[in-house]
């Protein structure tokens, strides 16, 4: 039995975790942030890093510090029934109902579709591409014991190779001086807050909770099994992963900001990166960009299928095996990607807006539980208040035809920051402060 991971083992797990986290969306957000921020780049980026890197790190830390086996174990601090409800809803929403189907379509829309033969229908191209993507994803997912090697040693280095191939050229031969670029929209009037909201909207804290089960099992694979040592290793790999994410975010945002003087403001970050790649590598750039996005999405999809399947096999041990769950989730994602992704996303987004505040409040309680001596009833009070407030964000994110104006109007009138999608923040902060003060007083009396 080992006491700790070697440096090489820590790097391998960190590389794997980075690969699981870092999908195409993690490139698209900072690229657009850079373009839109211009001269306000660094203050916008600071805000982005606070939530886009800080929240995922806290999610991983909450699993490590509480020595939890995964999300099911951590959310059990609220109640047994709630842990099943929250875990199922989170994994299904960020897995087969949302993020995995998007992993099929994003590389196709942003990179592969431009390489299709002339005359081929887009729907046909998507079907063929998603079939190939499905086969590769399922092949790796059915071998969960090798996920650390596949993602940590091969797919993540491949992604970084494509990424730095483009970015080094862009940094050595910048397209312009970002100091001369005028910020646009909210990045001109409130760059820090805009960056915070952009980082918040990556919703990577959910991924941090979801991928915890893979990190913990990988650490144990290397022979570290004592709970306190697993916790320490989890924290270490989380810090290394988030440092790498911060570096990649900073480079992407900087290159995006520099590109605007020559290429103009793109409609989104995917288009911006595609333009940058084609500028520096005419002809070849589209292929390099397509490969980079493909690998970025593939490794995240593999991680999500693995995490979802391991969790459901653990929650329902007498129903289906891990392999059967992996096949079912993969088929479901394949079908949604080709048939009804737009509809599914329109319903998944409101659920994500409900889940994210619940996840953040759980993380906050878990991290400070020992400090303030939180009991189960405190978890339940905090969760109930968060749920009631987050329902407002849920209703606001519903498709236009389903919104109840009386409800959203009431929430907008009562909750500060509601229009920013943060209506839960003030009341939950107040409740947390009250529970913390109560905990301190109780500890002094004990």
From Swiss-Prot:
A Pfam family the protein falls into: Branch_AA_trans
TM ranges: 13-33, 41-61, 81-101, 120-140, 154-174, 196-216, 237-257, 285-305, 325-345, 347-367, 381-401, 421-441
Keyword Transcription: no
Membrane topology label: Multi-pass membrane protein
CC per GO annotation: plasma membrane
Biological role stated in the UniProt entry: Branched chain amino acid transport system which is involved in the uptake of leucine, valine and isoleucine. The proton motive force is probably the driving force for transport.
Family to which this protein belongs: Belongs to the branched chain amino acid transporter family.
This protein's name: Branched-chain amino acid permease BrnQ
Organism: Lactobacillus delbrueckii subsp. lactis
